[in-house]
A protein has these predicted regions:
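Residue(s) in the substrate-gating loop at a strand-loop-helix junction
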Residues: 156
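C-terminal substrate-recognition "lid" of short-chain dehydrogenase/reductases
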Residues: 16, 94, 133-136, 244-273, ...
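Substrate-binding pocket helix/loop in short-chain dehydrogenase/reductase
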Residues: 111-113, 117-125, 236
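Canonical Rossmann dinucleotide-binding motif of NAD(H)/NADP(H)-dependent dehydrogenases/reductases
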Residues: 17-47
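Alpha-helical segment proximal to the catalytic Tyr-Lys
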Residues: 141, 186-187, 264
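Active-site helix of classical SDR
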Residues: 136, 173, 181
Length: 280
């Protein structure tokens, strides 16, 4: 009985998101799936959002079978109405929203600026920067009314460097997200609202494959081969210093810390998780 009581006590102690409601975008795979899974295991009620209907519903079903209180919503983050619906779904289902994880992202396949057409630029920024801004815009009033809340954005080391982690559009979008993170943190700290970002390096996800399918633009195929060869060679020099990719679960643990009360005085921070890649 004593052993059982200790286990129950220990379980309660590690439920860092008990009684919290979290909304995770890009939850069908990769970092988003790992974050949603970990948050649910830590006691949160989780709304999983993704454009991949089959994928997000499968992840949700898997978590429900394990006794987690979760639901899914299929959205296109480039549509403002879908973002509004996503937030309202969380409120309707669980009565509150405590944590917003802006994780949906798209990669630009390292296309340099001279070969970036408007379609590629606008697509990448709409998903990587405009969508998080809109989600935050809809969430802030809810957080203010509730007396606080937490936002965690999935940035990238590309938001802290010039070309190491992506092409022109991707780098610009992630720099913008880093700036947005700091802006939100400073402007709304008096309402007990925290906004931070995790900046991963290389992670073992399917973002490249998903991005190839999503990018309907000539840029991905129209980059001058000579330019691309030079750029790829330079980027590969950085890869050589840090060849191990992170597992999505490693990034999820960083997001968990930032979302939890353990990070109560962490606000406006960009937490790099890149295995020392940018330390070189």
């Amino acid at each position: 009985n004593k052993e059982k009581g200790f286990l129950i006590f220990t379980k309660k102690m590690i439920m860092r998101l008990k009684d919290k409601t979290a909304l995770v975008t890009g939850a069908a795979s990769g970092n988003g799936r790992a974050i949603a899974t970990l948050f649910a295991q830590e006691g949160a009620k989780v709304v999983l959002a993704d454009i991949n209907k089959e994928g997000v519903e499968q992840v949700t079903a898997d978590l429900q079978q394990k006794g987690c209180e979760v639901l899914s919503v299929v959205i296109d983050v480039t549509k403002e109405s879908d973002i509004e619906q996503m937030v309202s779904t969380a409120i309707s289902a669980f009565g509150r929203l405590d944590i917003l994880i802006n994780n949906t992202g798209i990669f630009d396949m390292l296309v340099p600026v001279a070969d970036t057409d408007d379609a590629l630029w606008e697509k990448v920024l709409s998903i990587n920067l405009t969508a998080p801004m809109r989600a935050i815009r809809y969430t802030i009033p809810i957080f203010k009314e509730q007396g606080g809340g937490v936002i965690v954005n999935t940035a990238s080391i590309a938001g802290l460097t010039g070309a190491r982690g992506g092409g022109a559009a991707y780098v610009a979008s992630k720099h913008g997200l880093v700036g947005l993170t700091k802006h939100v943190a400073f402007c709304y700290k008096e309402w007990n609202i925290r906004c931070n970002a995790v900046a991963p390096g290389r992670v073992d996800t399917n973002i490249r494959d998903n991005s190839k399918k999503a990018l309907q633009t000539s840029s991905k195929d129209g980059c001058l081969s000579e330019d691309m060869a030079k750029i790829t060679e330079k980027i590969a020099m950085g890869y050589a210093t840090n060849q191990r990719k992170a597992a999505p679960e490693e990034i999820a643990k960083v997001a968990l810390f930032l979302a939890s009360d353990e990070a109560s005085f962490v606000n406006g921070s960009i937490l790099v998780a890149d295995g020392a890649w940018t330390a070189y």
